[in-house]
Amino acid sequence: MPEPYDVITMGRIGVDLYPLQAGLPLARVDAFGKFLGGSPTNVAVAAARLGRRTAVVTRTGRDAFGEYLHQQLREFGVDDRWVTAVGEYPTPVTFCEIFPPDDFPLYFYRQPKAPDLEIHESELDLDAVRSARVFWMTGTGLCAEPSCSATLAALRARNRCGITVFDLDWRPMFWEEPQRAAADGPPHPAASARYREALAHATVAVGNLDECEIATGEREPYAAARALLAAGVELAVVKQGPAGVLAVHRDGSVADVPPLPVEVVNGLGAGDAFGGALCHGLLAGWETARIMRYANAAGAIVASRLACSSAMPFPHEVEAALTAGTAGAAGPGSSPPQAPTESGTAS
């Protein structure tokens, strides 16, 4: 039997076209960098950078951008055997704007449909999914068929064995559903129902406060964590932005960890670095607080850099950031130049 993967992720992939100039709206940007993108794909890259054997289950268009994504996955050491092409739809492209420290608008081009939503249950290698030490899926994978059925089939095949992570990953623009059925009901009833179904098969849930509210109806961090545990997971990880991260385990242990100081260049991708480091720490068997500190540091490093996938840190960089107590930008994914001021010099 083939050696099990440390981490298999399933879901979104695409090409990130990010400005090489900060502080400018897209209408004024004239230089872009091209990068591998898609949250679960970035998580696989992040875990691979930390020495883990990883693979991605997803689909691209049958086009030049799809070929580029295969090339990038191989260069990052991520197995692409389950990345297949869809002839009908183009590979998605995502643009962003960069307004540090906390404004990074995203523009997704996934019409008429993203190939990664065309994953079919019949195409899954369920033996590999079952045997992986960590299986990582996302909320976006539940937003449309056949991806939703395939994702739930993978979760059922896992049968809560090993570490099964549900990244709540709430992207409302990807969902098509009617307005809430009742005034006192959830704002997105179809999404909430699918999230509850997935949580019943997961052992770990990860999300920010907005995502936790979709999954549980709770926004207060401790209440959200308790609701995630009640939904079935063993470990609830609630990301609180500038307030850090809260992790609550079913065994009663709690880790409320502040963020690592960082001068933010691009906050996009920090959560994916956090996810890859979370997988790494869980596989290493570390105690919860140590995992959260390590994952926070990995995320902070990526936030100090321009790109997402190519900015994922190596172990020595994470350890150096933890030792220094701050994250710097040294390494791949360099900082973009600042937008010109009125005098024409960089701000």
Cite the ranges covered by each PLM segment.
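Conserved phosphate-binding/catalytic region of the ribokinase-like
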Residues: 1-8, 156, 192, 217-347
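Conserved N-terminal subdomain of the carbohydrate kinase-like
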Residues: 53-139, 320-347
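Hydrophobic anchor at the start of a short beta-strand
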Residues: 53-54, 80, 162-164, 236
